[in-house]
């Protein structure tokens, strides 16, 4: 079961886009179509963004986080262990969670340059209702953190997938810890696509 950020405001007077809020996670990943020329420019831009900014904040050696590309290298994916954001069985963010969320705030400052997807996962421990609840409430907590910073969350979308998308088999403590995670997808927005088509991207 997944849940999106449907119907949330952002405290800044901006209206959400109902059509976007209704998209599934899979649909949102491809919500801005790209021709090959535009896609090539965006891949180049995202590669630079990953190397010069994202990897410096979320390198493999930092808190178990990981950075990779997604969807033909057009989307950046940041993975943060849930244990670095939440205490066990808790849906309240840890006091130091801001250290790992702060680097994402820059991607919400220019509306629709990026569509930022926050996707919460857990392992197969507990009942189905528990797994759904904890991922829904944790994804909401992350969304609300960004909203509470006074950021424009018009293009921020949250999803909860319980234990539906494990990275590894849930057959050891280590594997279950890997499956409990927050994924943040930095998806090119319409503004980025328009800039690429007009030759206005800065590398």
Question: What are the roles of these predicted feature ranges?
Answer:
Residues 82-84, 120-124:
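Short, histidine-centered active-site or binding-site loop motifs used for metal coordination
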Residues 122-200:
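Periplasmic OmpA-like peptidoglycan-binding domain that tethers envelope proteins to the cell wall
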Residues 1-75:
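N-terminal targeting leaders that direct proteins to extracytoplasmic destinations
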Residues 55-71, 86-119, 184, 191-198, ...:
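Periplasmic peptidoglycan-binding/anchoring modules of Gram-negative envelope and division proteins
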Residues 24, 92, 96-103, 133, ...:
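Extracytoplasmic/secreted proteins, especially bacterial periplasmic and envelope-associated proteins
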Residues 5-28, 161-165, 171, 189, ...:
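Terminal low-complexity, intrinsically disordered regions
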Residues 76-81:
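Short, aliphatic-rich beta-strand segments
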């Amino acid at each position: 079961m997944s849940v999106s950020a449907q119907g949330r405001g952002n405290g800044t007077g901006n209206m959400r886009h109902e059509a976007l809020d209704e998209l599934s996670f899979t649909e949102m990943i491809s919500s801005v179509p790209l021709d090959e020329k535009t896609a090539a420019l965006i891949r180049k831009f995202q590669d630079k963004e990953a190397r010069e900014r994202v990897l410096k904040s979320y390198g493999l050696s930092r808190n178990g986080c990981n950075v990779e590309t997604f969807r033909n290298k057009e989307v950046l994916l940041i993975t943060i262990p849930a244990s670095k954001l939440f205490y066990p069985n808790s849906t309240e963010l840890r006091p130091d969670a801001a250290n790992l969320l702060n680097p994402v705030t820059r991607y919400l400052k220019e509306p629709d340059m990026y569509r930022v997807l926050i996707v919460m996962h857990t392992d197969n421990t507990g009942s189905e209702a528990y797994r759904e609840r904890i991922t829904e409430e944790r994804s909401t907590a992350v969304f609300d953190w960004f909203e509470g910073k006074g950021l424009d969350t018009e293009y921020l979308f949250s999803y909860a997938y319980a234990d539906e998308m494990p990275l590894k088999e849930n057959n050891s403590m280590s594997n279950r810890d890997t499956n409990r995670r927050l994924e943040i997808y930095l998806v090119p927005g319409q503004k980025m696509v328009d800039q690429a088509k007009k030759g206005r991207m800065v590398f």
